[in-house]
Swiss-Prot record:
Main location: secreted
Region (Disordered): 18-134
Claim: Signal is one of the keywords in the record: yes
Signal sequence, start to end: 1-21
Acidic residues: bias regions: 122-134
One GO CC term on file: extracellular region
Protein name: Psoriasis susceptibility 1 candidate gene 2 protein homolog
Keywords noted in UniProt: Secreted, Signal
Length: 134
């Protein structure tokens, strides 16, 4: 079974031209033809305005004026040019009312803070003296 697969692979390579039938171990002559058919490289600096030899044009020729260009067919809706923004004075912002209806919350819902002494206080000793252990 393996020999039939190998034989089929060999026939496929021969038909595709991957193996030359004349037994010549040198590479095929198709590589040299490609190099000979390519245009010669320019001999010197490029001339401004002349296209690079062998380079295809980047863009097609523009269509003649007056031809149908769908991107230029804008509807006559009067939307162009756009209207400038209105010059009305800005309106004051509406007050944020989290309680639109019902009973209103008290003015200050927080309890009063405890009274504090604003006199100078001694800071606590963060590093108390240690007793010596013997």
């Amino acid at each position: 079974m393996l020999t039939w697969k190998l034989l089929g692979l060999l026939v496929l390579c021969l038909c595709a031209g991957g193996i030359s039938g004349n037994g010549d171990p040198s590479p095929g002559s198709t590589d040299t033809h490609e190099e000979e058919d390519s245009p010669p490289l320019p001999l010197g600096p490029p001339i401004p305005g002349d296209p690079w030899p062998g380079a295809p044009p980047l863009f097609d020729e523009p269509p003649p004026p007056g031809s149908n260009r769908p991107w230029r067919d804008l509807p006559d809706s009067g939307a162009w040019p756009p209207k400038p923004p209105s010059t009305d004075p800005p309106k004051p912002p509406l007050p944020d009312d989290p309680w639109p209806a019902g009973t209103q919350p008290p003015e200050n819902p927080w309890p009063p803070a405890p009274e504090m002494d604003h006199e100078s206080q001694e800071e606590p000793d963060l590093d108390p003296p240690q007793e010596e252990y013997r």
